[in-house]
C-alpha cells in the first residue's frame, strides 16, 4: 500500500546517487533546510525548498506532515539479518561470558545446530508469527527495508519453509517493511552430512537451487566461508552454481580467521562480503577495485567481544561500506539501529555522515536496490525516517537510544511511540 504525502518544514539529510558511495564520497550528504518532499503513489516526485502551494491548498488530496524542522533521512536499510528462526540460545550467551568461544560451542552441538533443531520443529504459522514480531520491533527504529536469510533448516523442507515465510510476510500489507530474501543453505553442516561438506554442497545445488529459481524464493545466495565450515573452493562452487540459477552472490567472509573470503568476493563480483573482521589488506583492496560492498556488523563483534572490522581502513582504501545489525538467535540477538550507529562511529571510526550513508544508500547497494531506495531523490520510494531533533549527530550520540520519531514507508506514516 502507498499514499500521496507532502512533507514540509523538514531538514532533509541524505546521500545522493543511484549506486554505492565509495571512499570519501561516503561523507558527502545533501542537507536542505525548510524543505518539502512530495510523494505520489509511494514514489518521490519533488525534493526542494518549501512550496507555497502547501499553504494555498494545492495539496488537498495529499496527507500533510509538518516535520517542524526535524531531520528527515532515508529509511534505514538493514542489509544482513537472520530474523526467521525458532528457539533462542540465551544459555550460550552465558557460556561465552565464561570464556567459551563461538566455534567451540558449535563443535559441541550448540550454536547454529541448536537453532536448526528448534526451527525444524516449528510450523509455518509459528515461524511466521515469531518473525513478524521481530520485524515490528525493528521497524520502530526506522528500518524500511530488511534482508533476511534462510540457513536454519539445512534440509530441503525447512530451508524452503524459511524462504516461504519471508515471501508471505512480504505480501502482507500489514508488515510495513520490504523484505529481501537470501538463500543461506550453506550456513553450517547439518548432522546428516557431518564430515561430508562436498556432498552437502552437491545437495544444495541439486535439490534446492532449482526449486528456489522456479518459485522465485530468493534473490541472493550466501555462504559461510570460514575455516571449519565451508572452504574457499566449496564456496566458489556453490556461488558459481547459484549464479547459473539467477541468484546473486554474497559471502560471510573472514569473520573468524583471514581465510581469503574478501578476495573470493572480489573474484566472483559478489554484491557484498559481510563481517570481514579479519579481512586482509589485499582482500580489502580487491573489494574496492571490484565494487564489492563491505557490510560491517558491529553488534556482532560487540556481543562476541571480538575486534571490530577495520571500517576506517576500508573507507580510506576506497571501499563502499554498509552497516547492518546481523540480528540472529546466537551471536547477536539485537536489531538495534541506534547501537549500530554508536559502535560504528566509536569502534570503527566512521564519521556520523559515513554511518548515515552506510545504513541507507550503501545498505541499499548491498541489496542491489540503490536505484530505488537509500536516498531522498526524485524517482525513489517514499521511505523516510523523521528524527526527534534537527541535529542528525544525535544518531550515535544517543547511545543505544531510539531517536526515531516517525517512520514513513511508501508515503504512509508510522509513529515510533
UniProtKB/Swiss-Prot annotation:
Involved pathway(s): Amino-acid degradation; L-histidine degradation into L-glutamate; N-formimidoyl-L-glutamate from L-histidine: step 3/3
Xref: InterPro entries: Amidohydro-rel, HutI, Metal-dep_hydrolase_composite, Metal_Hydrolase
Keyword Zinc: yes
Localization terms from the record: Cytoplasm
Top-level EC class as recorded in UniProt: hydrolase
One cellular component (GO) term of this entry: cytoplasm
The keyword Acetylation is annotated on this UniProt entry: no
SS bond partners: none
Keywords tagged on the record: Cytoplasm, Histidine metabolism, Hydrolase, Iron, Metal-binding, Zinc
One GO BP: L-histidine catabolic process to glutamate and formate
Binding site for Zn(2+): 80, 82, 252, 326
Binding-site list for 4-imidazolone-5-propanoate: 89, 152, 187, 255, 331
Sequence positions that bind Fe(3+): 80, 82, 252, 326
Molecular function in Gene Ontology: imidazolonepropionase activity; iron ion binding; zinc ion binding
Residues engaged in binding N-formimidoyl-L-glutamate: 152, 328, 330
Catalytic activity: 4-imidazolone-5-propanoate + H2O = N-formimidoyl-L-glutamate
UniProt cross-references to Pfam families, sorted A to Z: Amidohydro_1 (PF01979)
Required cofactor(s): Zn(2+); Fe(3+)
EC numbers: 3.5.2.7
Co-factor remark: Binds 1 zinc or iron ion per subunit.
Family: Belongs to the metallo-dependent hydrolases superfamily. HutI family.
Function: Catalyzes the hydrolytic cleavage of the carbon-nitrogen bond in imidazolone-5-propanoate to yield N-formimidoyl-L-glutamate. It is the third step in the universal histidine degradation pathway.
Matches recorded under PANTHER family: IMIDAZOLONEPROPIONASE (PTHR42752), IMIDAZOLONEPROPIONASE-RELATED (PTHR42752:SF1)
Identification of the protein by name: Imidazolonepropionase
Gene: hutI
Amino acid at each position: 500500500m502507498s499514499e500521496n504525502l507532502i512533507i514540509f518544514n523538514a531538514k532533509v539529510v541524505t546521500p545522493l546517487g543511484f549506486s554505492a558511495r565509495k571512499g570519501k564520497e561516503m561523507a558527502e550528504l545533501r542537507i536542505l533546510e525548510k524543505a518539502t518532499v512530495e510523494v505520489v503513489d509511494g514514489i518521490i516526485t519533488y525534493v526542494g525548498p518549501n512550496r507555497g502551494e502547501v499553504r494555498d491548498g494545492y495539496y488537498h488530496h495529499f496527507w500533510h506532515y509538518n516535520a517542524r524542522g526535524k531531520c528527515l533521512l532515508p529509511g534505514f536499510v538493514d542489509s544482513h539479518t537472520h530474523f526467521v528462526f525458532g528457539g533462542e540460545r540465551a544459555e550460550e550467551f552465558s557460556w561465552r561470558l565464561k570464556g567459551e568461544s563461538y566455534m567451540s560451542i558449535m563443535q559441541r552441538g550448540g550454536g547454529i545446530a541448536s537453532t536448526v533443531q528448534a526451527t525444524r520443529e516449528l510450523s509455518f504459522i509459528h515461524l511466521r508469527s515469531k518473525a513478524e514480531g521481530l520485524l515490528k520491533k525493528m521497524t520502530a527504529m526506522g528500518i524500511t527495508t530488511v534482508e533476511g536469510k534462510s540457513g536454519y533448516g539445512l534440509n530441503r523442507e525447512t530451508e524452503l519453509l524459511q524462504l516461504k515465510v519471508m515471501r508471505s510476510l512480504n505480501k502482507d500489507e500489514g508488515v510495513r517493511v520490504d523484505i529481501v530474501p537470501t538463500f543461506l543453505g550453506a550456513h553450517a553442516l547439518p548432522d546428516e552430512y557431518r564430515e561430508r561438506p562436498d556432498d552437502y554442497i552437491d545437495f544444495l545445488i541439486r535439490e534446492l537451487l532449482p526449486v528456489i529459481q522456479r518459485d522465485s524464493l530468493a534473490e541472493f545466495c550466501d555462504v559461510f566461508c570460514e575455516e571449519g565450515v565451508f572452504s574457499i573452493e566449496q564456496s566458489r562452487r556453490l556461488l558459481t552454481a547459484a549464479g547459473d540459477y539467477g541468484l546473486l552472490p554474497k559471502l560471510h567472509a573472514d569473520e573468524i580467521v583471514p581465510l581469503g573470503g574478501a578476495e573470493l568476493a572480489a573474484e566472483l563480483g559478489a554484491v557484498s562480503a559481510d563481517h570481514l573482521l579479519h579481512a586482509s589488506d589485499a582482500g580489502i583492496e580487491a573489494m574496492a577495485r571490484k565494487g564489492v560492498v563491505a557490510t560491517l556488523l558491529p553488534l556482532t563483534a560487540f556481543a562476541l567481544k571480538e575486534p571490530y572490522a577495520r571500517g576506517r581502513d576500508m573507507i580510506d582504501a576506497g571501499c563502499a561500506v554498509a552497516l547492518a545489525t546481523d540480528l540472529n538467535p546466537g551471536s547477536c540477538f539485537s536489531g538495534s539501529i541506534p547501537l549500530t550507529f554508536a559502535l560504528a562511529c566509536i569502534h570503527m571510526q566512521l564519521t556520523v555522515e559515513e554511518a548515515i550513508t552506510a545504513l541507507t544508500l550503501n545498505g541499499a547497494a548491498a541489496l542491489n536496490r540503490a536505484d530505488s531506495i537509500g536516498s531522498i531523490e526524485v524517482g525513489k520510494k517514499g521511505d523516510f525516517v523523521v528524527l526527534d531533533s534537527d541535529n542528525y549527530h544525535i544518531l550515535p550520540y544517543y547511545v543505544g537510544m531510539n531517536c526515531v520519531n516517525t517512520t514513513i514507508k511508501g508515503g504512509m506514516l508510522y509513529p515510533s511511540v
